[in-house]
Amino acid sequence: MRQSKFFMPTLKEAPSDAVAKSHQLMLRGGYIRQVTAGVYAYLPLGYRVLRKAENIIEEEMDNINVPEMIMPHLLPATLWQESGRYKKYGAEMFKLQDRHGRESLLGPTHEETFTEIVAKNLKSYKQMPLALYQIQTKFRDENRPRFGLLRGREFVMLDGYSFAATREQLDEQFDDQKSAYLKIFNRAGVTVHPVIADSGTMGGKNSTEFQAPAAIGEDTIATNEKGTYAANLEMAKSIDTFKQEPEEAKDLAKVATPGMDTIEKLADFLKVPSTRIVKSILYIADDQKVLVLIRGDKEINEVKLGHILDADEVRTANADELVEITGSEKGGVGPINADWADKIIADETVKDLYNVVVGANETDYQYQNANLDRDFKVDEFADIRTANEGEPDPVDHLPLKFTTSIEVGHIFKLGTYYTDTMGADFLDNNGKAKPVIMGSYGIGVTRMLSAAVEQHLTENGIAWPKEIAPFAIHLIQMKMKDETQTKLAEKLEKELSAKYDVLYDDRNERPGVKFNDADLVGAPLRITIGRKAKDGIVEVKRPMDEKATEVNISDLDAVITKELG
């Protein structure tokens, strides 16, 4: 490919609103251009990278016998209403009406459609296990699109779906997909951690995220140094090392605590450690009033709590509701005489505490010396706390380390979440009707490309992993009017293009312009044809090298083969 004919509008400086390095470099290098907030055009350089990533996916899916297909972008609302997700998905769904008033949506994912088109046509256990996938543009009405391709309103995604007659088949499919995904990320040069994750609005109970460590990441993962435990912070567990020595129960005492509306203020006012205080927070779970208790030095993990409550909507009570329901403003709510609560759930940290401070359900008042069972009851204990960095992990009891990361993939064991509600049954080997068991598998392809850039930055540009680099070799001719350089450049272009993707910079530009653009192209090998062309010598440089190396033309093939294969 001749660079003089290649549309690659580079920028000297990134726009001021581009925060992520990947966003800055993709704009500066002419990979993408913004059309509107969260929506991008993929220019030739960016599209080459995208297609190479898609080719890797196609090859690895072929290797596990999963065929590709394509579903429509425009979906009827009725399918999502049938599954119950039309309302649950929330404001991020692009909804529209046709001229006849029929409601539709732009697909953010396709579980319902695959259930309707595929699962409902699987009538016998003999047709399973089966898996299919597609690579297509998805739509999500992000409230704050940002970081370029990392959080957009339109993005390219691989989404795959599996169909099984038994749980054992689903487990095998899940493991096959996980293995294939790890190979995809490895070939794309993206370092990932498979971590325990929340299924969110997707349904099902078991899921694994693939998290790519990066400074710009919006997620946090908790891992140990041995790699035997890894979880998204939303789902991370840890061992609580605090132990309170048993005490004789003291008399319950009501005390005034004016203006003490935080744990820190209350602990200082009462001269007690935060571990001797039990926080009480009122949640509204659908139409239930749930009082949640946790030790004062810990924070409630609302994702874990949501799993326990299993409600469509879980939120904290607002200020007016607090007073109306409990009789107290914030800071004074507590579990004693909390007959207004439909349920009381406590974190495990509350189990073995003695003579603690709890709210008195009266503004500016607390009880001291409250004791579980004697003074208040708990309906259910569960792990609903947020893990802290440095706490022991639950597997090897090693300190947890927190890392910011980018979610680039997510796989789910959906089970019968969709097939139950949408009526997709098959006949088992005994002739009995059963719901098809499903799995769902996704890679954010464009997000993966941004993660690759974030993990492969150079001082002035990108060092693309070789399998997704837009070009394997960037051939740069220093003086276009030098016939010796031109002859050698054209000879190398012809020879190398037979085996590799080659970009030949044949522009009549200054060397500084050419080298700056080459840093942004980020080809695994840069071959510069300069003043020593007459001696049969070129300069070879990898993106991470500080200086180029002179190589005789007779040795060039061996050097290239060593680097690129």
UniProtKB/Swiss-Prot annotation:
Its main location: cytoplasm. GO terms for biological process: prolyl-tRNA aminoacylation. It catalyses: tRNA(Pro) + L-proline + ATP = L-prolyl-tRNA(Pro) + AMP + diphosphate. This is Proline--tRNA ligase. Its EC number is 6.1.1.15. Keywords: Aminoacyl-tRNA synthetase, ATP-binding, Cytoplasm, Ligase, Nucleotide-binding, Protein biosynthesis. It holds the Pfam family tRNA_edit. CDD domains: ProRS-INS (cd04334), ProRS_anticodon_short (cd00861), ProRS_core_prok (cd00779). It is an enzyme of class 6 (ligase). GO terms for molecular function: aminoacyl-tRNA deacylase activity; ATP binding; catalytic activity, acting on a protein; proline-tRNA ligase activity; transferase activity. Homodimer. InterPro entries: aa-tRNA-synt_IIb, aa-tRNA-synth_II, aa-tRNA-synth_II/BPL/LPL, Anticodon-bd, Anticodon-bd_dom_sf, Pro-tRNA-ligase_IIa, Pro-tRNA-synth_IIa_bac-type, Pro-tRNA-Synthase_IIa_type1. It is found in: Cytoplasm. Consists of three domains: the N-terminal catalytic domain, the editing domain and the C-terminal anticodon-binding domain. GO terms for cellular component: cytosol. Belongs to the class-II aminoacyl-tRNA synthetase family. ProS type 1 subfamily. Catalyzes the attachment of proline to tRNA(Pro) in a two-step reaction: proline is first activated by ATP to form Pro-AMP and then transferred to the acceptor end of tRNA(Pro). As ProRS can inadvertently accommodate and process non-cognate amino acids such as alanine and cysteine, to avoid such errors it has two additional distinct editing activities against alanine. One activity is designated as 'pretransfer' editing and involves the tRNA(Pro)-independent hydrolysis of activated Ala-AMP. It comes from Lactobacillus johnsonii (strain CNCM I-12250 / La1 / NCC 533).
